[in-house]
């Protein structure tokens, strides 16, 4: 089977990691795999040599002029279509909503099937009337759709029998499988994600500042890069926490550091299905997460495998972190229950479900 993935680039991020991991698995299981990107062929994550990467690179499409933007998008569709036909793909998977509509239009009147994916929160992400209309419109023109959660499928009116499927995120980071909970955890609180507004790292930093004096020696490490970096650095300096809050940048091996943390925190306003939280739970790191739409409450049973807090509440985040740090027995219970996800969300299991599904399209 000739399988294609369509994604903007192969930088660091959840969709990018999922793309690379699925592509690697498919290639190692006798499938021909191609990845089509918009911006370059370099991958942040290790990519098997068996996987080919092609670039439909037209540079940055001008956003200010509607006509130029439209012309640029049309050119890109034809660039993708050319690659699809040259490689004779059986299926092209759009690894986001934007990539899904490109996949649909690029495969019109070809033998290639288009499969869409919903990786964000369709109820909240750019939730304009036009965006909602386009999401649902292109959904019906795909040959299949993969959802990460039941809630996402409900947004589109439920599954269309065998054409659609709900497949939760796998633990795509292979390093996770090689790690065991440490005998003694370090005085570290960790978070991982792009430094963008919806991740609410400002909220986490504020929460940490509320309990910093009560947990001497503890430090907060945030792994990731993004547009909010300068604002977060200013916040850290304003709160007098330069020696205790570290913006550690993007690091593909951050998971090894997280494994030793006393607490992992996800502070987002909303998510699709957070890879970083899934990995931390599977490693047995005691976790705190906002009860944001779609994702955390499908991974965490509150008080059993982690702690869920109200979205936007720095006070609750602070209290939850403190509860874990001050109660070792409670932290151990969260660790043991969270680690059960290592089996249910293994890359072998989830990737096999993906491949079996694609063969039915």
Please describe what each predicted stretch is.
Residues 55, 301-303, 307-314, 323-328, ...:
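Conserved acidic donor-binding segment of nucleotide-sugar-dependent glycosyltransferases
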Residues 94-100, 118:
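Short His-centered aromatic/hydrophobic patch
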Residues 316, 323, 330-344, 356:
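A short, well-ordered alpha-helix in the C-terminal region of glycosyltransferases
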Residues 250, 269:
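Aromatic "clamp/platform" in nucleotide-sugar-dependent glycosyltransferases that forms part
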Residues 286-290:
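Short hydrophobic beta-strand element within catalytic cores of glycosyltransferases
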Residues 5-13, 17-21, 25-68, 155-157, ...:
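N-terminal strand-loop element at the rim of the active site
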Residues 4, 182-208:
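Conserved donor-binding/catalytic core segment of Leloir-type glycosyltransferases
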Residues 126, 154-158, 165-186:
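Acidic anion/phosphate-binding donor-loop and adjacent secondary structure
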């Amino acid at each position: 089977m000739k399988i294609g993935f369509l994604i903007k680039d192969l930088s660091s991020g959840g969709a990018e990691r999922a793309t690379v991991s699925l592509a690697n698995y498919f290639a190692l299981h006798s499938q021909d795999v191609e990845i089509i990107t918009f911006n370059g062929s370099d991958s942040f994550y290790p990519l098997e040599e068996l996987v080919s990467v092609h670039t439909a690179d037209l540079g940055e499409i001008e956003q200010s002029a509607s006509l130029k933007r439209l012309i640029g998008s049309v050119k890109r569709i034809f660039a993708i279509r050319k690659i699809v036909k040259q490689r004779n793909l059986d299926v092209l998977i759009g690894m986001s909503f934007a990539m899904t509509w490109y996949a649909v239009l690029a495969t019109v009147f070809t033998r290639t099937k288009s499969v869409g994916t919903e990786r964000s929160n369709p109820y909240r992400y750019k939730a304009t009337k036009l965006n909602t209309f386009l999401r649902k419109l292109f959904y019906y023109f795909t040959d299949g759709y993969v959802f990460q959660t039941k809630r996402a499928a409900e947004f589109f009116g439920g599954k269309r029998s065998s054409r659609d499927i709900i497949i939760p995120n796998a633990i795509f980071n292979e390093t996770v499988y090689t790690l065991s909970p440490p005998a003694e955890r370090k005085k570290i609180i960790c978070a991982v994600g792009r430094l963008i507004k919806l991740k609410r790292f400002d909220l986490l930093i504020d929460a940490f500042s509320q309990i910093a004096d009560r947990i001497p020696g503890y430090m907060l490490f945030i792994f990731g890069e993004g547009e909010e970096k300068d604002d977060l650095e200013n916040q850290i300096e304003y709160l007098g926490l330069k020696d205790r809050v570290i913006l550690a940048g993007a690091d593909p091996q951050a998971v090894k550091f997280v494994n030793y943390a006393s607490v992992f925190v996800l502070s987002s306003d909303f998510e699709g299905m957070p890879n970083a939280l899934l990995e931390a739970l599977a490693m047995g790191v005691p976790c705190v997460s906002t009860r944001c739409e779609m994702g955390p409450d499908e991974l965490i049973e509150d008080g059993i495998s982690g702690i869920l807090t109200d979205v936007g509440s720095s006070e609750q985040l602070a209290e939850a972190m403190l509860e874990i740090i001050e109660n070792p027995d409670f932290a151990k219970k969260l660790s043991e229950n969270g680690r059960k996800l290592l089996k249910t969300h293994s890359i072998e299991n989830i990737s096999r479900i993906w491949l079996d599904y694609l063969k039915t399209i």
